[in-house]
A protein has these predicted regions:
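A short helix-loop-beta-strand connector motif used in the catalytic cores of GNAT acetyltransferases and
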Residues: 48-63, 91
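Conserved beta-strand in the GNAT
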Residues: 63, 69-78, 96
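Conserved GNAT acetyl-CoA-binding A-motif
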Residues: 118-129
Length: 171
C-alpha cells in the first residue's frame, strides 16, 4: 500500500491504541464463544497495558499510519532464556489491522518491521497465539509459515467437577 508509514508507537498514540486494542478484543471474541470476554475493569486496564508495552526495553510496538490515521499496530517482545533451546525468542503478542484496511499488505509490513527488531536481538524463533476459529488469523500466519505447536484448552470449573464425579461413579 502506497503512502503507508510504519513507525514506532508514541505516547501520543495511546488513546487510539487503546481503542484499537479493544476492537481487537471484540474481534477475537466473535469466532469462538469460549474465548474469555473482557470485563469493564479489563477495558479500564487497557490504557495501562498499552503504556507498559511502550515502556518495555525488550518490546516494540509499531503502528501503520495512512493519511494521518493509525490503521494497524503490532507488538512483540524479545526474551533470552538458557533453560530451553532455542535461547532467543521473539513473541508477537498483538497484531491488528482495521477491518477496512485488511488484505492490503499492512499486516505483512508490520510483521516485516517487527522482524528488524527481532533480527537485532538475534532471535532464533518467533512464536505467537491466535484464537481457534479465527480463519483470517490462521490463513495470515499460515501464509507466513507459522505452524501450530501446542493447543490451550479451557473448561468451566463446574463442568470439570461434573466430569470428575461421573468418572468416579463409573469406577
Amino acid at each position: 500500500m502506497r503512502d503507508l508509514l510504519i513507525r514506532s508507537a508514541e505516547r501520543s498514540d495511546v488513546e487510539e491504541l487503546v481503542r484499537l486494542r479493544l476492537l481487537l478484543q471484540r474481534y477475537m471474541e466473535r469466532p469462538n464463544p469460549r474465548v474469555w470476554r473482557i470485563t469493564k475493569e479489563g477495558e479500564a486496564h487497557l490504557r495501562e497495558e498499552i503504556e507498559e508495552m511502550l515502556a518495555k526495553e525488550d518490546g516494540r510496538m509499531l503502528v501503520a499510519v495512512k493519511d494521518g490515521v493509525i490503521v494497524g499496530f503490532i507488538y512483540g517482545e524479545f526474551s533470552h532464556r538458557t533453560t530451553y533451546t532455542p535461547n532467543n525468542i521473539g513473541r508477537i503478542s498483538i497484531l491488528h489491522v482495521r477491518e477496512g484496511f485488511r488484505r492490503r499488505g499492512i499486516g505483512k509490513r508490520l510483521v516485516e518491521e517487527l522482524c528488524r527488531f527481532f533480527a537485532s536481538k538475534n532471535v532464533e524463533e518467533v512464536t505467537l497465539n491466535y484464537i481457534i476459529g479465527n480463519k483470517e488469523a490462521e490463513g495470515f500466519w499460515g501464509a507466513l509459515g507459522f505452524k501450530p505447536v501446542r493447543i490451550g484448552a479451557n473448561i468451566r470449573f463446574e463442568r470439570l467437577m461434573e466430569y470428575l464425579s461421573s468418572i468416579d461413579s463409573q469406577s
